[in-house]
């Protein structure tokens, strides 16, 4: 099984704050899988660390009020290009991110409040027919049976 995975989940320090979201449940799940690490922001050459960004009225804006939507959309395009010739069975993406969030994203108020929504890369993958799951679903018992 070939699995596309947000690089931060596997311990790559590529989050906006220079840290990672290493998830041991995901690491264990992926032990016997072929893994393709992806970080759209890293592919696009975004700085690490960089200002926090959220989706505000459909556009990505950073915490300083700067519209960074074009940079994030470029990042998604680069990530899609990187995987275009891959036969990916599953994508496991980081929760809440304006790029990779699957079920929820931050609401754009920069207060930590969540709302139902999908990040730009997760949305693009779903639109192209990929099976996309939130990393937080990895611990659910039903997941392995459904893959």
Feature names for model-found ranges:
Residues 11, 45, 98-101:
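Short, active-site-adjacent cap segments at secondary-structure transitions
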Residues 21-62:
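Short, surface-exposed acidic-centric catalytic microdomains
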Residues 79-109:
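N-terminal glycine-rich phosphate/adenylate-binding segment common to multiple enzyme folds
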Residues 1-4:
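Extreme N-terminal starter segment of soluble prokaryotic enzymes
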Residues 8, 94-97, 137:
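Short, well-ordered beta-to-alpha junction loops that form the rim of enzyme active sites
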Residues 22-35, 75-90:
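Short amphipathic alpha-helices and their capping/turn segments at secondary-structure boundaries
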